[in-house]
């Protein structure tokens, strides 16, 4: 399986994540995907061919293997990692939408050159407003997917340990036959390791949700105690009504200053311009 596309996607979202989110991504790729690709797939590569039963009845090996291993461990973990990583698409789409709106605002303001547009693409979007909700929802879905897959894994393989010998009496086996599992100890070690990594990811997801809620409450309390500063040039600042009003006031003040310069330079026409200025002020 090629994980390059998934890595590229999550790396892009990682730029806008919290510190806990970056740790989660490291656990996903170092302790889960790398182990799955490098070691686990080779360990489970012969699981079907090396599952041997002490009978020559055609089809007995296949039905016994399907009874005790309905879903391969590797395929189940691969599906789990894909679904756990999918909620990051929600954050990626939201960030792309915000950057698209900001680029449109820059073009309307006359700053649509490639340098400014590339700067918008590179700068980090702060987790606030609707992005905060999108990020929290994505983390909650990651948490739910992890918990559901661990429960499904427990239902399929109770105890999480790989047995050495299983007894099978499913048709078309002539009687109760003994079937032997290849590399049971090695598979048990990898199973425990992958489940432990999944448990660590669950803890990180819970910690990230708590951290985001606490930080949002702290920001709200700070805004209530101290009025928000109007300085800065972030995305929210560019689209806020205060920013737009400040820009309008700046343009009006520049026009007023230009009018005063004209009055100083042309005393003869100063009275007429002053009268027009007074009429405009009265309006």
Curated annotation (Swiss-Prot):
Residues that span the membrane, as ranges: 23-45, 76-95, 131-153, 192-214
Record keywords, A-Z: Cell junction, Cell membrane, Gap junction, Membrane, Phosphoprotein, Transmembrane, Transmembrane helix
Record GO terms (molecular function): gap junction channel activity
Membrane topology (UniProt): Multi-pass membrane protein
Modified residues (Phosphoserine): 233, 258, 266, 277
Subcellular location: Cell membrane; Cell junction, Gap junction
Annotated GO biological process: cell-cell signaling
CC per GO annotation: connexin complex
InterPro entries attached to this UniProt entry: Connexin, Connexin32, Connexin_CCC, Connexin_CS, Connexin_N, Connexin_N_sf
Segments in the Cytoplasmic topological domain: 1-22, 96-130, 215-283
Gene3D superfamilies with a match to the protein in the record: Gap junction channel protein cysteine-rich domain
Main localisation: membrane
Extracellular side: 46-75, 154-191
PROSITE patterns, per the entry: CONNEXINS_1 (PS00407), CONNEXINS_2 (PS00408)
Function summary: One gap junction consists of a cluster of closely packed pairs of transmembrane channels, the connexons, through which materials of low MW diffuse from one cell to a neighboring cell.
Recorded family membership: Belongs to the connexin family. Beta-type (group I) subfamily.
Subunit structure: A connexon is composed of a hexamer of connexins. Interacts with CNST.
PANTHER family (alphabetical): CONNEXIN, GAP JUNCTION BETA-1 PROTEIN
Name the record gives this protein: Gap junction beta-1 protein
Gene from which this protein is expressed: GJB1
């Amino acid at each position: 399986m090629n994980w390059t596309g998934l890595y590229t996607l999550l790396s892009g979202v990682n730029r806008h994540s919290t510190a806990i989110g970056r740790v989660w991504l490291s656990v996903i790729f170092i302790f889960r995907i790398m182990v799955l690709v490098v070691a686990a797939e080779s360990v489970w590569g012969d699981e079907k061919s090396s599952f041997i039963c002490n009978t020559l009845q055609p089809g007995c090996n296949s039905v016994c293997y399907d009874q005790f291993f309905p879903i391969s461990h590797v395929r189940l973990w691969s599906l789990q990692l894909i679904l756990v990583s999918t909620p990051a698409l929600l954050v990626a789409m939201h960030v792309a939408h915000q950057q698209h709106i900001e680029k449109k605002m820059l073009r309307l303001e006359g700053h649509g050159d490639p340098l400014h547009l590339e700067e918008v693409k590179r700068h980090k979007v702060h987790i606030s407003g609707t992005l905060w909700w999108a990020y929290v929802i994505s983390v909650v879905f990651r948490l739910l997917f992890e918990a559901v897959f661990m429960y499904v894994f427990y239902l399929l393989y109770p105890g999480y340990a790989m047995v050495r010998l299983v007894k099978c009496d499913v048709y078309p086996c002539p009687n109760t036959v003994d079937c032997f599992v290849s590399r049971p100890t090695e598979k048990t070690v990898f199973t425990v390791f992958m489940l432990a990594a999944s448990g660590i990811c669950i803890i990180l997801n819970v910690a990230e949700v708590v951290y985001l809620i606490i930080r949002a409450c702290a920001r709200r309390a700070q805004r209530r105690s101290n009025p928000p500063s109007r300085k800065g040039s972030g995305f929210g600042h560019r689209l806020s009504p205060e920013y737009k009003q400040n820009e309008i006031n700046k343009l009006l003040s520049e026009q007023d200053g230009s009018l005063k310069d004209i009055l100083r330079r042309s005393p003869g026409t100063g009275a007429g311009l002053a009268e027009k200025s007074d009429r405009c002020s009265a309006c």
